[in-house]
C-alpha cells in the first residue's frame, strides 16, 4: 500500500501520496473517490520518470471534512491545490483530473496559467460547455438536483443498506469501497457538499465576461460508456483552449476511465505530458523601445 502523508493547508488537513522524482504530476480525483482512484496510474507515471502527487481532496478519503457547504466552493478547492503545491515546493505541475477533479483542473488552468505545465481532463469537459448544456445532458445529470437537500439526501441514500446510492452508482468504479468511505463520520455530507456548493461549475465565476482561455497544452479523454457525462462536454472543450488541444475517445470504458481503461489512460498520459509548449510561452517577448 502506498503511504500517505498529511499537511495542513488553506484551513484543512490534506492527505496525499507523494511518490517518485522528476517533473511533478498532480492527480485530482472526484466524487466519491480518493487518491486510491489513481492506483494504476501512480506506478506507471513514477516508472515514466515523474514525481506523482495525489491528494485526497477536501471532504474525501483521509483529508479533513468540513460540514459547511461554503467550504466546498471551487475557488476554495483550487486554493487547496495551489497551497499544497507551494507547500511541497512545486511551482508548475502537470495537472490530471477526473470528474470533479477535472472541473477543478479546468478552473485552475484559466485562473493560474503560469502555475501549470500540461492539463489532462478525464470525463468532464470545460465548464464553459456546461454553461449551456443540452437537454440530454440535463437529463443525465438528474442526480445533481437530488443531492441538493441537506439531511434529506443523506437519509435517502443511506436507507436500506445504501440501496439508492448503489442504484445511482451502479457497478461502476470502486462501488463497495465508496459505501465504506462514505459511512465514515461526516463523509457523505462532505461529498454531497461539492454538488451543493457548485450546482453549476460555470456559475462559480458569476461574470458576463467570457472564460479566460486555457493556455496550457490540454488533453481531454472521454469514455464512450459514460452515462453521467455526454461526449458533447469534452468534444466541445477545445474552443476554450488556446494552447495545443487534443481529444481522445476510449470506446470500451465508462465514467471511471482510470479504472476501466488503465493501460490506455497510462499510455495517453505518458505520451502527452511534457510534449507541448503553453501558448503564453510561444509568444515573442515585446521589444523594448
For the regions a language model picked out, list residue spans one by one:
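An N-terminal hydrophobic leader/cap segment in hydrolases
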Residues: 1-5, 289
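Alpha/beta-hydrolase-fold serine-hydrolase catalytic core, especially in secreted/extracellular enzymes
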Residues: 275-289
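Conserved HGGG/HGGXW glycine-rich cap/lid loop of the alpha/beta-hydrolase fold
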Residues: 15-64
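A short, glycine- and basic residue-enriched loop/turn
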Residues: 34-35, 103, 253
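Catalytic histidine-centered segment of alpha/beta-hydrolase-like enzymes
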Residues: 253-262, 266
Amino acid at each position: 500500500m502506498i503511504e500517505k502523508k498529511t499537511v495542513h493547508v488553506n484551513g484543512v488537513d490534506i492527505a496525499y501520496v507523494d511518490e517518485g522524482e522528476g517533473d511533478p504530476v498532480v492527480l485530482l480525483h472526484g466524487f466519491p473517490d480518493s487518491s486510491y482512484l489513481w492506483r494504476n496510474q501512480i506506478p506507471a507515471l513514477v516508472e515514466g520518470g515523474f514525481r506523482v502527487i495525489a491528494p485526497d481532496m477536501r471532504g474525501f478519503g483521509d483529508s479533513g471534512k468540513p460540514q459547511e457547504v461554503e467550504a466546498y466552493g471551487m475557488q476554495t478547492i483550487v486554493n487547496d491545490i495551489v497551497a499544497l503545491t507551494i507547500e511541497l515546493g512545486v511551482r508548475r505541475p502537470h495537472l490530471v483530473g477526473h470528474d470533479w477533479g477535472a472541473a477543478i483542473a479546468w478552473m485552475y488552468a484559466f485562473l493560474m496559467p503560469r502555475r501549470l505545465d500540461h492539463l489532462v481532463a478525464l470525463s468532464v469537459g470545460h465548464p464553459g460547455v456546461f454553461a449551456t448544456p443540452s437537454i440530454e445532458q440535463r437529463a443525465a445529470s438528474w442526480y445533481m438536483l437530488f443531492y441538493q437537500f441537506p439531511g434529506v439526501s443523506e437519509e435517502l441514500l443511506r436507507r436500506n443498506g445504501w440501496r439508492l446510492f448503489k442504484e445511482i452508482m451502479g457497478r461502476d468504479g470502486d462501488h463497495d469501497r465508496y459505501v465504506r468511505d462514505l459511512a465514515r463520520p461526516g463523509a457523505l455530507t462532505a461529498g454531497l457538499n461539492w454538488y451543493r456548493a457548485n450546482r453549476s461549475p460555470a456559475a462559480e465565476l458569476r461574470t458576463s465576461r467570457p472564460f479566460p482561455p486555457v493556455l496550457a497544452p490540454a488533453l481531454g479523454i472521454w469514455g464512450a460508456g459514460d452515462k453521467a457525462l455526454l461526449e458533447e462536454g469534452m468534444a466541445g472543450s477545445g474552443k476554450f483552449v488556446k494552447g495545443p488541444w487534443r481529444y481522445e475517445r476510449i470506446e470500451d470504458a465508462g465514467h471511471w476511465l482510470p479504472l476501466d481503461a488503465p493501460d490506455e489512460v497510462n499510455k495517453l498520459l505518458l505520451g502527452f505530458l511534457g510534449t507541448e509548449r503553453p501558448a503564453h510561452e510561444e509568444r515573442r517577448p515585446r521589444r523594448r523601445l
